[in-house]
Amino acid sequence: MYRAAHLNRRTFTKYIMFYYIVISFFSLWIVARSGYLYTGDDILFNINRIEELVATLENKSLISYISTFTSNQVGIATNIFYPNLWLYPFALLRIFFKNPIFSIYLGLGLLNFLTCIISHFTFKAFSGSFSKAFLFTNLYFFSTYRWIDLIRRFDISECIAIAVMPLIFWAFYETCYRDHTKWLWLAIGMALLLYAHILSFLIVTFFLVIIFLINLNKLTDFKTVILEVTKAILVFVLLTIGFLYTFLQTYLSITIQPPRIRDLSMTALKVGTLMQSTFENNIYKNGAHFNLGLMSFIVLLLAILFYSKLSSFYKQIIFLFIFCVLFATTLFPWSLMQTTGLTILQFPWRIFIIANLLFCVLGTKILGYVHLKHFDFASIAVITLLGLFTINQFFVFNEENTKLDASTDAYGSLFRHEKLKINQKSYRCLIPSNRNRDYTPINKRESEKRSTSVYNIVVSHQMLLGKRKLKVKKLQAIPNGVILQTPKISKRSSVSLPFYIYQKHNYKVLVNGKRKHFSVDRYRLLHIQLKDSKSTIMIQYIPSLTQVITIMISILSFSFLLFILLPKL
């Protein structure tokens, strides 16, 4: 009898996995069937990151530190400040299938499936119930905010963060309150989160600390918990030291242009707009469309109705959820926070990554209190159909977008939030279009106007000879570097080349095949003495021995966990 039940459970699991595969790719096919990508807030940034990695791999190099094939080809250290580990699958798919639109949607489909797998098995471990895990996975997969991130904003990094968050919160709960031996999963989850999205990592870390402090009196063995959390932190450091060392060393040694600081009181959501978008389940309209979806409102109403039946654990989730929602709105005193570290958020609604998970956990519990015939099946059907309908509405709403072509100023159009759609032919128009100054080195003594002026000179590939400007004759990208061909110079001159230098010891410069001494000017551009003739200059970023060692430590740590330790667990 046990064997029969075991076989039935295994068969049922296979059916569920097949269902997850179907919804993962069918939900994206609804959008992808026209052969277009639709413009999102972060599409330029992420397309450039993927294409940089593609070109790096195609040129037989494994790691991209600076952008030389994309992002204006001026050596911006995007991948030092914004980890790209999770983009390798997208890059490999892009290389294998050639069609960029198909490969990106295929990558997003795999991300969908990963979200299902992590959600299902972590919630199964948390609740001990297969059916609850299935319900939670459907709620989480079709959650409105996740789809806003995925297809409306094209924020791949935050979507990956959303995918791994159930693992983190489950491992945190187990480590602190139930099974202390699960600390290793906490370390792995936090490492995967850091490699996905630094801001999400900071938000999640902050909330874990808050939850830990709120529930300090519920720890049954404080010393053991502290020991296990310390072990998790140490393993986390081993897994991420390859990124953290280079990131911190570069960040602390120079001043960089941070992502734009915004007025939080202006980017916070108005309550009325949030409510309207919630009732509309809106993922497709321009403007203030950020919301948690109609299901979140239904779950909150049911939570209030069944409040007396809930344990203190779920009551706490209700209050945390309400706090997150209010935190994202103008009801929170954001004008008082403008001079604090909270400006790193840029948009208060980023906290919805927490609220989204909380409402799905709460919804799974609450829907279990509704005792109606076939309600379990009906609730799954409603969640699925509502999700698919909303995704289709996005497609219908954006199908009339203007086609991007070579004559379109892609960056300007996207900056003005114009609606565009991109096919395989026009995809290349996105690559040279990123004029974003984020992560470029800056001199705080220079005015904003002057810094912008110099940046525009640099991205147009002009050399600075005192007050004169000369266009580079030819530019060829190589992995983590470029080869420049200069025009003929009338006399021996000191020249600032259109290429950013972060830490001087990391760069090698060859002029006409010979190693050349160089300096760095006040704009952090490569400064060099050139003779009165044409020159071929190769500039390349070379990681230090310490950087290589830290990367190897992280690779070996992941390998040990993946091939030796985790199979035993």
Feature-to-residue mapping (PLM):
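Start-transfer (signal-anchor) and selected internal transmembrane alpha helices
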Residues: M1-V31, F560-L569
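Active-site-proximal, structured, solvent-exposed surfaces of multi-pass membrane proteins
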Residues: R9, K449-L569
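Transmembrane signal-anchor helices characteristic of membrane glycosylation enzymes that use polyprenol
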Residues: F12-E52, L234-L244, G387-Q393
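Membrane-embedded helix bundles of polyisoprenyl
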Residues: Y20-S24, N79, G107-F126, F130-C176, ...
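Active-site lumenal/periplasmic loops and adjacent helix-entry segments of GT-C-fold
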Residues: F26-T122, F126, S131-V164
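Hydrophobic alpha-helical membrane-interfacial segments at the cytosolic entry of transmembrane helices
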Residues: F222-Y245, I317-F323, I383-T384
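Periplasmic/ER-lumenal interhelical loops and adjacent helix-loop junctions
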Residues: E228-V229, I233-I304, K421-Y427, P432-R437
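Signature aromatic-anchored transmembrane alpha helix within multi-pass, membrane-resident enzymes
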Residues: G368-Q393
